[in-house]
Regions:
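Short, well-ordered alpha-helical microsegments
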Residues: 78-80, 171-174
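Signature for phosphate-centric chemistry
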Residues: 96-113, 118
């Protein structure tokens, strides 16, 4: 027996997995765009960083301080978010965690909407009608999320907590994959910037 009362060599209880969305990007969403303009907007969004001066929620900071592994998507907004919460500690950048694409429907140029509405319709058409415009499709994104879930579960298997700084929708896909693997969601803060979803093994 060990000092904790567990048999020597016993498998440790897996740590938790916390999926956090990045902070608010610097790119302004206060515009109305055509489909073509939204494509350009999304490309800029994908390479852009964070709006300066943000303060992450105390709960997320606490999760990061107590975690054994901190991982971020390779997108700049996720990397900068991880830098804010890491406070100097090292973290891993993982390309597997980037956001699923948002190609807009091919609607005429007289249709102008906010980026938020374009994002909604783009995701709807991508999810239900396989509108991917030659980019990653739903099945491919779900397979990538399943691979990410397996890697995160492997990291947590030793008993250390894992925190991920990534993206709103792809975090949802990872969460679905984790639940299929027996993980239970114990915290869900919605879809706002810096929000978290926390998973534990029963």
């Amino acid at each position: 027996m060990t000092a904790t009362g567990k048999p020597a060599g016993a498998t440790p209880r897996p740590g938790t997995i916390t999926l956090a969305r990045h902070g608010e990007p610097a790119l302004s969403r206060d515009v109305r765009l055509t489909a073509a303009e939204y494509r350009d907007f999304w490309q800029k969004y994908e390479i852009g960083g964070l709006l300066p001066g943000q303060t992450p929620p105390p709960l997320l900071i606490d999760f990061v301080e107590r975690c054994g592994v901190l991982v971020a998507s390779t997108r700049l907004r996720a990397v900068e978010s991880a830098q804010v919460v890491a406070k100097g500690r090292s973290f891993t950048q993982e390309p597997l965690l980037i956001e699923a694409p948002l190609p807009p429907p091919n609607w005429p140029s007289w249709v102008r909407m906010s980026p938020k509405l374009w994002g909604f319709f783009s995701r709807f058409f991508w999810w239900f009608f396989n509108h991917h415009h030659g980019e990653e499709n739903r099945a491919q994104a779900e397979a990538r999320a399943a691979e990410a879930a397996d890697k995160l579960a492997e990291l947590a298997a030793s008993g250390q907590d894992v925190v991920v700084l990534a993206h709103g929708f792809f975090n949802v896909l990872i969460g679905r994959a984790l639940r299929k693997r027996g993980w239970r969601m114990t915290l869900r803060e919605g879809y706002k910037y810096w929000s978290t979803r926390r998973f534990e093994r029963p």
